[in-house]
Curated annotation (Swiss-Prot):
Major localization listed first in the record, in broad terms: cytoplasm
Organism: Mycobacterium leprae (strain TN)
Record's protein name: Octanoyltransferase
Miscellaneous field: In the reaction, the free carboxyl group of octanoic acid is attached via an amide linkage to the epsilon-amino group of a specific lysine residue of lipoyl domains of lipoate-dependent enzymes.
Site description Lowers pKa of active site Cys, residues in chain: K147
C-alpha cells in the first residue's frame, strides 16, 4: 500500500503535554500554513483541559446545558458533531499534506487502523462500525457497542487538520452531558475501563505515534478499504 502523504520526509512528532484548545487550534492553523508553504508534516500529541468541541452539524439538543455544566463549548471548523476532550484522553492532530488524488475517506481509515492496532497491542479488540466514524468496542450480552476513540478531520488546501481522540483514563461522566458525536444509542468507554487496569496517556503515546506514521506511509495494511470520495470532513 502506498503512502498517502505527498512528501517522503519524516513526520515531525511533537509531544506537548496539556494545551488549551484555542492555543492548539491556532498552532494547527500555523502548521498547516507552513506545510502548504513547503514545511514538514507534523503530528501533535497532547491533552486538553476539559472542553466540549462542536462540529458544524451539532444540533441544539446535543449540547450540554450551560446552567448545569461549567465546561466551555468551542465551535470548531471541523465536520461532525459535539465531543469532549479532557485529562486522560490522548488527542492527536496530524497536519499532513495529502497526495493526489485526494482521498479523505482513505486518510480517515488509516487513522482508524492505527488506533485499532494500538488497542490490539494492549489486549483490546476494537473495530469500525458501518456508518459511524471512530473506533468501537463491539457490543455483547445486551451491552451496546462503546466508542473508545473519536475521529474528526478537516482538509483544506490538501492539508489535514484536527484528528483523533483516544480515551485512555478519562472522566467518562463528562460525555453524559452531551450526545457524543450525535449518537444516542451507544456508549462511550476508555482503555482503562475495558481492560480493568490503568492505561495512562503516557502508556500509549509512543505506540500511537509509530502506528499513525506506519498507517499514513502504507506500512500498516488496512482491514477495510474505501473507494475514493470527495469527503472533506468527518467525525
Amino acid at each position: 500500500m502506498d503512502s498517502i502523504r505527498s512528501i517522503p520526509t519524516a513526520i515531525d512528532v511533537r509531544q506537548l503535554g496539556t494545551v488549551d484548545y484555542h492555543i492548539a487550534w491556532q498552532l494547527q492553523r500555523d502548521l498547516a500554513d507552513a506545510r502548504v508553504a513547503g514545511g514538514p508534516d507534523t503530528l501533535l500529541l497532547l491533552q486538553h483541559p476539559p472542553v466540549y468541541t462542536a462540529g458544524r452539524r451539532t444540533q441544539p439538543h446535543e449540547r450540554p446545558n450551560p446552567s448545569l455544566h461549567g465546561v466551555p463549548v468551542v465551535e470548531t471548523d471541523r465536520g461532525g458533531k459535539i465531543t469532549w476532550h479532557g485529562p486522560g484522553q490522548l488527542v492527536g492532530y496530524p497536519i499532513i499534506g495529502l497526495a493526489e488524488p485526494l482521498d479523505v475517506v482513505n486518510y480517515v481509515r488509516r487513522l482508524e487502523e492505527a488506533l485499532i492496532k494500538v488497542c490490539a497491542e494492549l489486549g483490546l479488540d476494537t473495530s469500525r462500525v458501518n456508518g459511524r466514524s471512530g473506533i468501537w468496542v463491539p457490543g455483547s450480552a445486551g451491552q451496546p457497542a462503546r466508542k473508545i476513540a473519536a475521529i474528526g478531520v478537516r482538509v483544506s488546501r490538501a492539508t489535514t487538520m484536527h484528528g483523533f481522540a483516544l480515551n485512555c483514563q478519562c472522566d467518562l461522566d463528562a460525555f453524559h452531558a452531551i450526545v457524543p458525536c450525535g449518537i444516542s444509542d451507544a456508549g462511550v468507554t476508555s482503555l482503562s475501563a475495558e481492560l480493568g487496569r490503568t492505561v495512562a496517556v503516557n502508556d500509549v503515546r509512543s505506540a500511537i505515534a509509530e502506528a499513525v506514521n506506519d498507517a499514513l506511509d502504507g506500512w500498516l495494511a488496512l482491514s477495510w478499504l474505501s473507494t475514493p470520495a470527495s469527503v472533506t470532513s468527518t467525525l
